[in-house]
Amino acid sequence: MSDPGHAALVRDAPLLIAYDGSEGARRAIDVATSLFPGREAVVLAVAAPVTVREALAETVGVVQGFEEANESVALETAAEGAARANRAGLIARGRGEIAVPTWQGILDVAGEIGATAIVMGSHARTGLREALEGSVSHEVAKHAHYPVLIVPPRRA
């Protein structure tokens, strides 16, 4: 029986780098570049359609404005990450998406592009903070059919 994750490593498909602009995401690009120099990559930033606060806005036009702003931020963040990845030595393009939950958006794009692997940084949340905020990297790893490289934060 064929393992789709293993097959993905054999193909010459792009990496998917999840990028949110954080130090962990920047480090993930650096690690991806050192492991896969010159590789094609899609740098993905995922934003929520609207936040709870935004959803409480009274008019449809206001909510629609928030959705457009969130999409714009995702596109800008992805472009920033792609520029960083290109400077580091990958052949990267940015992509912004709107999805809830974030991890599902990452997996959807990985499937769409046939990613070789998913690379992402970790925010290293623990305890109560992780229970309240969740861990996108853990959810991606748990549900993925692709290899997932979770890059830990730099040690102090």
What residue spans do the PLM features occupy?
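A short acidic, glycine-rich active-site loop
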Residues: 61-76
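Glycine-rich, Arg-bearing micro-motifs that act as flexible, cationic patches
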Residues: 12, 117-143, 153-156
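Active-site phosphate/pyrophosphate- and oxyanion-stabilizing loops and adjacent acidic/basic residues
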Residues: 30, 107, 138
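Structural beta-alpha unit
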Residues: 1-10, 83-118, 156
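Small/aliphatic-rich secondary-structure junction motif
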Residues: 7-62
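Solvent-exposed polar/charged
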Residues: 34, 111-112, 142
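General small-molecule cofactor/ligand-binding pocket signal
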Residues: 42-44, 93-97, 149
